């Protein structure tokens, strides 16, 4: 038996590649650093400056309707928010409910659809592809679609429920504080479920066939196959998808505003809607900036905690 050593292979294939000196690597690294400067400048201008400016405005009483209103007020805006602004606390509560219910519902439905269509071929592949269609529909289009579906007179939802005998009189879905948030969440879940379906489908495709076959040889049941074999591979997709969807739902303005404009009676007013109303309806830029800073701080804390938990799980 002939044994081919690494040295022999290198010699037969030609002369070894020239060694790269430490100075060359350092020079190449500096070139890459200089190439990154334009991107850093653009990010600093597009993201950094507005963020710093918003923090500065949050400590002033800036109001576009008052030419003299640009004085420093310290932490007065924050004190008012926490102690004398019930709408802020309502909007924060609505944001949490909207985000939590939307992410959990869309994630569970996406997981069930991914598992149900995992091993199906033929026409079911086409069906699964069609399930991804809502993800490509613009948010404003989704908002107007469900806006007309939830109309009390002539809406598809009321007509279907009345034909099934579930209700006898039309429900004022978007004009009732009890049902408005539910209607908005349903529209959002329909729009974001395909994202989780795509994430979980890709994660299931990464499960090694050898592991699945070994589990079948050991006569693992469907539940054991799911909990012990597939779920560990789905964990990263679930964590990443949840983080991205929480950020998106926290910032979701066009869907809610197009359907309800935050009403009725502030029942669907979230933080992003409240900031918009303060800044562009009431022109209180200082107060709106204070809400925006708190909104950003909540997102940063959530992202930091979530990423740390993900790293601990991986380690």
Model-derived features: positions:
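Short, intrinsically disordered terminal tails adjacent to the first/last structured region
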Residues: 1-22
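Short, Lys/Arg-rich N-terminal segment immediately upstream of the first membrane anchor
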Residues: 18-30, 228
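A structural signal for multi-pass alpha-helical bundles of membrane permease subunits
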Residues: 31-315
